[in-house]
Swiss-Prot record:
Its main location: nucleus. Residues 107-116 have a biased composition (Polar residues). Residues 103-132 are annotated as: Disordered. The lineage of its organism: Eukaryota, Fungi, Dikarya, Ascomycota, Pezizomycotina. Chromatin interaction component of the NuA4 histone acetyltransferase complex which is involved in transcriptional activation of selected genes principally by acetylation of nucleosomal histone H4 and H2A. The NuA4 complex is also involved in DNA repair. Is required for NuA4 complex integrity. Component of the SWR1 complex which mediates the ATP-dependent exchange of histone H2A for the H2A variant HZT1 leading to transcriptional regulation of selected genes by chromatin remodeling. Component of the INO80 complex which remodels chromatin by shifting nucleosomes and is involved in DNA repair. The keyword Transcription regulation applies. It is found in: Nucleus. SUPFAM superfamilies: Actin-like ATPase domain (SSF53067). Keywords: Activator, Chromatin regulator, DNA damage, DNA repair, Nucleus, Transcription, Transcription regulation. Belongs to the actin family. ARP4 subfamily. The keyword GTP-binding does not apply. This is Actin-related protein 4. It holds the Pfam family Actin. It comes from Gibberella zeae (strain ATCC MYA-4620 / CBS 123657 / FGSC 9075 / NRRL 31084 / PH-1) (Wheat head blight fungus).
Amino acid sequence: MAQQPLSSSAQPTDIYGGDEVSALVLDPGYCSTRAGFAGEDVPKSILPSFYGHVTGDNSRDLFGDECLIPRENYEVRNYMNKDSVVEDWDVAARIWENMLVNRLQPERQTPPSKNGLNDDPRPEGQDGEGDVAMDDAEAESMEKPLGENPLLVTEAPWNTPKAREKAIEIIMENWGCPAFWMSRTPVLAAFAAGKATSLVIDVGGANTSVTAIHDGMVLKRSIQKSPVGGIWLSSQIRSLFETSEPQVELTPTFMIENKTPVDALSSPSVRLRNFPYSITDSFRAYEEERVLTEFKESVVEVWRGPGRYSVPGNEEFVKTQPGRVFEMPDGYNQMWREQRFRVTEGMWDENAGYPIPEADRLNKTQTIPELIRAALNAVDVDLRGNLLANVVVTGSTSLINGFNDRLNTELMAMYPGLKIKIHAAGLTSERRFGAWIGGSILASLGTFHQMWISRKEYEENGPNVVEKRCK
């Protein structure tokens, strides 16, 4: 049973007194990490979760825009795995601290005892009017980077107890936060949409998850996840380029020295840069992913229906419709018509996508309709109608044109007798940052103050308190 919050009269007033709390919200993901102040509309600080590592004698790590500059002996890595669970805690702590402290906090003032303004030249033992004494506890609190900021951190619904305990340990021990909370991303996305009960479909960069939320709690048996996300779509686009006639060369922007405009389908007229060192595969793949992301955002579309895209006649119909032109970094450009629909079709029909390596291929249970079916089959029959009337769509990959229309078509075909209502934020930022916005709302509520895990509670119970409190 979850621990009951203290009554408001018993709350420590230094943390819980009043509605004004300078709380921070941190939302780590596989593709990017978001951070900002509770109560604001969007995160103030957004950094890639990828970082650069220079090997050799001058070994070091590089974050943010520094990752985009090619270097010798330079690898691009990620501190998370594709399940959105932290793997490299040393790097994670450094990235998070950089975002929460260096980017969000004002420069800290030097303590009066150390700024030299109160030094008194008189001999020891004589009182000096300007002397300022500071006890050890006060000095320590001044040195902790987040000593005045409660912190709410989001997590994937399948996050491990070990990872949760490691997070609170870093935040309390290293940063000195006065209070902490950890909340699952589907719950926060539902809060951002104003729903306490909902079916949350989160289509992110590394994976897609479907989770049933009832009265603000995750129904754990309903949690379903699949690798069908933005990275998987990128593998479909690579396959499209490789099987096109003519074959499309994927040359990342950093390799282009100059280019000349050419007609559609003509070979590119480009001069490539020469580097005095070899470019690593990981850096090239990272730069190629940026081009593929641009292609996804501007060209790729989801077939809305009726029926599946593979139904005879649908592809012929699409060929008669206006296409979209995309220019590659090297200047090659082409009109894309039916191909841009087939790229996303594998999300809904495992047999309809482009051929990709066996390791990345989806089976039927990993498609979005089957994830939804499995999630709903795992919950009580009486809840299903309420969940389908409150479907919340979030995640940046859900912004692909036509996604919500196709989702509605699939749900109506699967559950013809039930009312289907999809809630998807219209603003791009609200869809991309749904979990962060939910955390921002939650951490800024006066009624939530009594829920924080205080520093005193952490010191009494240890890191395991996060498992007991954050259900």
